[in-house]
Regions:
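Phosphate/pyrophosphate-binding catalytic cores of soluble transferases and nucleic-acid-acting enzymes
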Residues: 1-310
Length: 310
């Protein structure tokens, strides 16, 4: 398997699709928000990128959950292995592509996870606490658990932080069992984008998404009966656009806050990927500004050296 990672706006999908077209691979997404149906513009699905030379590249784990629900890491790990095992049995090359570092690391390392029920008493005790207060509690729990899960990338709202605390608290009294998920051997390619170029692309992409109907997309989700707090839970575009629609922010306030949040998110993504290197992953960094054919040649040279496709 080949894994392609990188921060938002680094061109992961187009590179993964072009590489998959060259080697006959199918793509498994590793994006914690693209799993949701009808959340297309805000999550940046860019499904047109999966068409290369008029050929549609098969992709998986996109549009598999209903908006308003809370898809989680445990579910992703199960769904990943269902698809992975099927593709392997058919001897299909696989490209794992996404910016959710926790999802990528969990499937490559084979983290032993279990479904964690909600704890109403704990949730009530955490109500009213600020995000910074919740983060301090989470850091302490992670230290006690020796946990690498729940990076700031994944807890950018109070609801997410409370859920992370709930999981870490559960793990303290329910140690992970002996059975591990199988580790997955993979060549990892990281897309490295210049900071200034990344910031420019993020800002332009945000303008494009707003011009192409992102506000209308969020309105339609609200009109379908999804509570505002459920959309705010998803963070970033869905958080700030929802706050704009319900009157908590002006358009200019929404744009400014969202732009800052996405820049911070991209920075945290890179922090996670650098942390993966410290935790023993070898990542082959590729300059995203290179022409696509040079990127493909880079990947093929690595495949020629390591021959890690399945």
């Amino acid at each position: 398997m080949i894994t392609i990672i990188g921060p938002t706006a680094s061109g992961k999908t187009s590179f993964a699709a072009a590489l998959s077209a060259r080697i006959g691979a199918e793509i498994i997404s590793a994006d914690s928000r693209q799993v949701y149906r009808r959340m297309d513009i805000g999550t940046g699905k860019d499904l047109d990128d999966y068409v290369v030379n008029d050929k549609k590249i098969p992709y998986h784990l996109i549009d598999i959950a209903e908006p308003g629900t809370q898809y989680n890491l445990f579910q992703y790990q199960q769904d990943f292995h269902t698809v992975y095992d099927k593709l392997q049995s058919g001897n299909r090359p696989i490209v794992l592509c996404g910016g959710t570092g926790l999802y990528v690391e969990a499937v490559l390392k084979g983290y032993a996870l279990s479904p964690v029920p909600q704890d109403p008493v704990l949730r009530e005790s955490l109500e009213g606490k600020s995000l910074s207060e919740l983060e301090k509690i989470l850091v302490e729990l992670k230290t006690r658990n020796h946990s690498v899960m729940h990076n700031k990338t994944d807890v950018d709202t109070t609801n997410r932080a409370i859920r992370a605390i709930e999981i870490e608290t559960y793990q303290l009294s329910h140690p992970v069992g002996e059975r591990q998920m199988p580790k997955v051997n993979s060549l990892i390619i990281g897309l490295d984008i210049n900071r200034d170029e990344r910031r420019r692309k993020i800002t332009q992409r945000l303008k494009d998404r707003l011009a192409n109907g992102m506000v209308e997309e969020v309105k339609s989700l609200l009109d379908s009966g999804i509570p505002a707090e459920n959309l705010i839970y998803y963070g970033l575009e869905y958080k700030f656009v929802t706050q704009y629609i319900i009157g908590e922010l002006s358009f200019d306030e929404m744009f400014a806050a969202l732009e800052i949040a996405i820049h911070q998110f991209a920075k945290r993504q890179m922090t996670w990927f650098r942390g993966m290197e410290r935790r023993g992953f070898q990542i082959h960094w590729l300059n995203t500004s290179l022409p696509m054919d040079e990127k493909i040649k880079f990947a093929e040279s690595l495949l020629g050296n390591d021959n890690i496709i399945n």
